[in-house]
Amino acid sequence: MNKQSCLLMCLLLALPFATLYAQQLEGKVIESGTGKPIAYANIGIYGKSRGTVSDEQGHFRLNILGMSDNDTLRFSMIGYERLDYRLGVARTRCASSCNIELVSKSYGLPEVVIDPKKEMKTRIVGNNIESDKMTAGMSDSTLGHEFGTMIEIKRKPALIEEITMHIAKCSHDTVFLRLNIHSSKNNKPDENLLKTPIYVQFTKEEAKQPIRIDMSPYNIKVQDDFLVSFEIVRELGAGEFYLTAGLFKDKVYYRRTSQAEWRTYGALGIGIAAKILQEK
């Protein structure tokens, strides 16, 4: 075999490994300054349905097959400044392994103020659907998949006291989700209002009753409609997970990963409601 043939064969043998090397990113998301692992951080291609969530130790693995070097790779987490990379840069930096450092976020004073002199009332808003005659299943259990409902409050300041999720059927031994509260802009979900992450864990036995999340420790005040959503941050495994549902109960909002565009599904509402304290 001459030198030219030998070189060609070596290149052909190396090609599959080089291609595989560039198709997957691996790394660890840590806190800048402390090196502490950041669990359940969001990693994804901005504006596209390609993403994942870091595990309990901050490790992540993301398939980037078919993505452009000009795409934006975004790392984000509640309580931290988001970090963007051009995918071409990240492809080189994280093809083997890398540490991604996120900086803690500083929050200003809340913009929504509730007048203590005004008379207040407690309201249940959203879809407080207890009947399981109609259900809506979760067809996508991708890490980072998010689903929820828009809560209307008629443009009066309100304090969120409790979130309730009504589950029609759950065959998973344990479900672990992250609760998100998004403001709205032009009738679409906007910024996440939470300053610290809120996780919800329950067993299939506990799912037979409404899942209630006490929001009083978080002091979340809203001025306008807001989206309540739940996000898959741990693998669910095999099984079924259905929420109660009802016709003409607003739309289901969902996105496949944290960086994907929000989409809506028809006039079928899912059993997510909120208890709020609002000015009369």
Regions found by a protein language model. Name each.
Residues 23-38:
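Structural motif
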Residues 35, 41-45, 58, 73, ...:
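Hydrophobic beta-strand segments
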Residues 49-59:
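Short, acidic Ser/Thr/Gly-rich low-complexity loop/linker segments typical of extracellular
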Residues 61-71, 218-223:
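Short Pro-Gly-centered beta-turn/loop motif in secreted/extracellular proteins
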Residues 72-87:
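A short, solvent-exposed loop/turn motif at the edges and junctions
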Residues 107-184, 225, 231-280:
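Beta-sheet-rich sandwich/jelly-roll-like modules and their strand-loop junctions
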